[in-house]
Curated annotation (Swiss-Prot):
Organism: Mus musculus
Protein name: Prolyl-tRNA synthetase associated domain-containing protein 1
Alphabetized Pfam families for the sequence: tRNA_edit
Family: Belongs to the PRORSD1 family.
A molecular function GO annotation: aminoacyl-tRNA deacylase activity
UniProt xrefs under SUPFAM superfamilies: YbaK/ProRS associated domain (SSF55826)
InterPro entries for this protein: ProX/PRXD1, YbaK/aa-tRNA-synt-asso_dom_sf, YbaK/aa-tRNA-synth-assoc-dom
Length: 169
């Protein structure tokens, strides 16, 4: 399924849950540094997303944190119970297979594509930071979609995922 079809399916799913969104179209971006000039005017929590696997390639995690967080994979591995040194970045092939998005497009909004293989880790600051909106790519890195933190959680749970909420402060 093409990115535009996946985005349309995402928008349909959000609509079915009565979730209102705000979308900003922008040039394709592959890094936070490239993205921020296009969306820094949007008030709220902007995301950085990491698609990770364990050393044995048996488990996958999508980790969503505030865009300016630095993540230590060893510390995160300990928090997730897989041990220090056991988390790795998953390759694009695995991300395409599990979440139907490629490099630069990792997003928790793609969790509706997952068959239950991916665990979702969410920075608690998205829910506890008093943000009016939280922002993610809508299946493409040429747009950014904002929704309320409450609606975001409703969407995530509707995909069958119970987020692992961690404090990254």
């Amino acid at each position: 399924m093409a990115g535009s079809e996946l985005r349309a399916e995402l928008e349909q799913r959000l609509g079915a849950l009565a979730i209102r969104t705000e979308v900003v179209e922008h040039p394709e971006v592959f890094t936070i540094e490239e993205m921020m000039p296009h969306i820094q005017h949007l008030k709220g929590a902007h995301s950085k997303n990491l698609f990770l696997k364990d050393k044995k390639k048996k488990n996958y995690w999508l980790v969503t944190v505030l865009h300016d967080r630095q993540i230590n994979l060893n510390d995160l591995g300990k928090q997730l119970g897989v041990g220090s040194g056991n988390l790795r970045f998953a390759d694009e092939t695995a991300m395409l297979e599990k979440l139907k998005v490629g490099q630069g497009c990792a997003t928790p909004l793609s969790l509706f594509c997952d068959d239950g293989d991916v665990k979702f880790v969410l920075d608690s600051a998205f829910l506890e930071g008093g943000h009016e909106k939280v922002y993610f790519h809508p299946m493409t890195n040429a747009a950014t979609m904002g929704l309320s933190p409450e609606d975001f959680l409703i969407f995530v749970k509707a995909t069958g995922h119970d987020p692992i909420i961690l404090n990254f402060d």
